Amino acid sequence: MPRRRVVAKREILPDPKHGSQILAKFINHVMVSGKKSVAESIVYNALNTVAARAKTEEPMAIFEKALESIQPMVEVKSRRVGGATYQVPVEVRPARRAALSMRWLVDASRKRGEKSMALRLAGEILDAAENKGSAVKKREDVHRMAEANKAFSHYRF
């Protein structure tokens, strides 16, 4: 953390196809070893698959609904008090909420069994939009952990 001035947030350019900043950020999360064109093709193919499977809704709406269903409201942070380490529940900032949901969606997709990453990602997006799947389970686990440690919430940061 800088001591003098606050570092300005960098502006993320919207993705070329849908014009969405959220999707551009998500493409960056999917990207491995700087291969952005590969990540873009994976995400766009996944959205095309989502559009084919769910004919009624717009694929971007399903994607945003999926991210919304994964976002955690509270998480636990370790706080050391007199030799004991407590897991203290804290509220999650909106920017971190979005980043965690994207990270969990990509991680859950990578662990799935479908053939290509685009199919895995599409499957996980559809599952998350219906409040099921590994990414939603991860959010539930984080919430459960925060609920279990509610007694330590007075050790605020």
UniProtKB/Swiss-Prot annotation:
Domain of life: Bacteria
UniProt GO molecular function: rRNA binding; structural constituent of ribosome; tRNA binding
S-S bridge residues: none
UniProt KW keywords: Ribonucleoprotein, Ribosomal protein, RNA-binding, rRNA-binding, tRNA-binding
GO-annotated biological processes: translation
Protein family (similarity comment): Belongs to the universal ribosomal protein uS7 family.
Main function: One of the primary rRNA binding proteins, it binds directly to 16S rRNA where it nucleates assembly of the head domain of the 30S subunit. Is located at the subunit interface close to the decoding center, probably blocks exit of the E-site tRNA.
Subunit structure, interactors included: Part of the 30S ribosomal subunit. Contacts proteins S9 and S11.
Protein name, per record: Small ribosomal subunit protein uS7
Species this protein is from: Marinomonas sp. (strain MWYL1)
